[in-house]
Amino acid sequence: MTDAGPGATAVPRAPGNGTGGAPVPSSPVVPSDVPHHRTAGDGWVECACGRRHWGRFGAAGLLLARRDASGVPVAVVLQHRAPWSDQGGTWGLPGGALAPDEDAVTGALREAAEEAGIDPSDVRPTGTSVLRHPDWSYTTVLADEIHPAEPTATDAESVEVRWVPVDEVADLPLLAAFGDAWPDLRRRLGAGPDTADALPGGAPTA
Ligand SMILES: [Zn+2]
């Protein structure tokens, strides 16, 4: 509730983060003074739904949950998107375009490592949720924290990456698609891997 509102895109930089206090660009140009990863899947898809989406081979993101001792999810990792990015200033999942022939789990973990400094060995994927469009798809990879993970913004795509209490997620200005998906994703986190597309190795469902 102390976070900047949706109109506040000029987030002050923390001192001493190595960027020298450069102004936050207001134009949709990737800053050149911060790391930015590229894959062969980077690019827009003109979708038959009438919109365009990022990721020539689809996209994926990581929904990483921290649970309390009784297994109840208490926080998830969210990314505060850089002002220059699509729907800049909103909060969503660390993730991005899949590389050619890259499966969604691999891609989501790769992007989470690149953007949020999340070590894949600290994470256990538990399931996926796929949003299908005519010419594109987005896979949310649900995962549990198995070793303490301290995410941080590690490239140009994030203003901030942090644990957000589950009960506070809906109060943030969310990326539209993530906001639409959040009620179902939250239910799935709470219910555990109870659906048909739970990953092999998850808890038995029958
Ligand atoms: Zn579409």
Name each model feature, range by range.
Residues 92, 156, 177-178:
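Short, glycine/charged-enriched secondary-structure capping and boundary segments
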